Amino acid sequence: MEKGAVYTGIYPNIFELAGYEKKEIENRLDQIFQTLFYGSDEERIYHPVGCDLGYIEDTGNLDARTEGMSYGMMMCVQMNKKEEFDRIWKWARTYMYMAEGENAGYFAWSCGTDGTRNADGPAPDGEEFFAMALFFASHRWGDGEGIFAYSEEAKKLLHTCIHKGENGEPGRAMWDSKNYLIRFITEVDFSDPSYHLPHFYELFAQWSFEEDRSFWKKAAKASRDYLKKACHPVTGLCAEYAEYDGTPYTKGQNIWGRHDWYYSDAYRTIANIALDYVWFGADEWEVEEGKRFLEFFCETAGEEHQDGIFAIDGTVIPGKALHPVAMTAVHAQAGLLVQNEHALACVRKFWNTPLRTGNRRYYDNCLYFFAFLALSGNYRIY
């Protein structure tokens, strides 16, 4: 029997399983959205601009990134907030979209909050979230005109992502045409395990331009296979950046800094695996991965290292995580994969953890929102 919400329409509410009341859960989700979008200046990450624009701020770096802008759009479409969605999308299309040059059709990954570009290159995790949010917007609200013809914008963006550089055109594709794996950035030939969203690619395979659909179907399989290589067989941990064979990327530390460890970007990987399982139920390996991951944090790592830095084999590396609330959130989200004692303990810990405040709140609270959305059965396919 086929599993997954795409077949059954069922999105499990793990908070209810942990003993929380449905009304309490829904109220908390609304409160989280209101805090992130309309809270005090010390709480919010969303800023409306004028009558029809808005942006999501990376409060630690004081900029607007395609990561955050696309996350904000996904938050809005999931919560049925069309005005805020359109404001963020128009800001991105106005200031981030590149209409010419070798990256034409992509979005500059970082801009100042005044719209000034900080970079001329894209980051593929932004593009894939933009596309998915746009498809969902089309299906929830219908297509409008111009940049608000959501589905057409998504299709064109995805086409650029996989065909850029063909037929002598300048630039490079975001996905490698030989192995169907997403690149960390277009200029390099290694990946970031947390960029791999097979549950998105399955839907792209249904909704993209017809000539692109077989590519996305292959990309979904390639990403599921890749995650098995990138995640450690004992701990379940993965690195921030990894080679195409899944091994941690150790080169270029003078350029990128160190990223061969379980650290900031890598937290998203287990959350993505969990959502893939909820939506598609395509691979029982994902359940085993969830068990390994939870066992590592709940037994092996111990309470004193819940916010630690680790090599992917579980070796403790000196220092503390920059985003401890994000770690708490994704530990809980692993509870979508397996509902054992470890999982429920992590879910309850997350429930009792407030949103982060201070200048590092942006990344933590984005992962917090998505974890709460998923655990409450509200991170849905539209």
PLM segments and residue spans:
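Short glycine/serine- and small hydrophobic-enriched flexible loop segments
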Residues: M73-N80, F129-R140, H199-Q206, A271-V278, ...
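Outer membrane beta-barrel
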Residues: E83, R87-W91, Y95-M96, A123-L134, ...
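Solenoid-repeat scaffolds in large eukaryotic assemblies
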Residues: G72, E84-F85, I147, A154, ...
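Extended ligand-binding clefts on enzyme/binding-domain cores
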Residues: E2-Q31, T35-Y38, E43-R44, L62-T66, ...
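Aromatic-rich carbohydrate-recognition surfaces in CAZymes
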Residues: L62-M69, R117-G142
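Solenoid-like repeat scaffolds
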Residues: K349-N359
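Internal amphipathic alpha-helical repeat/solenoid segments
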Residues: R28-Y71, C76-A119
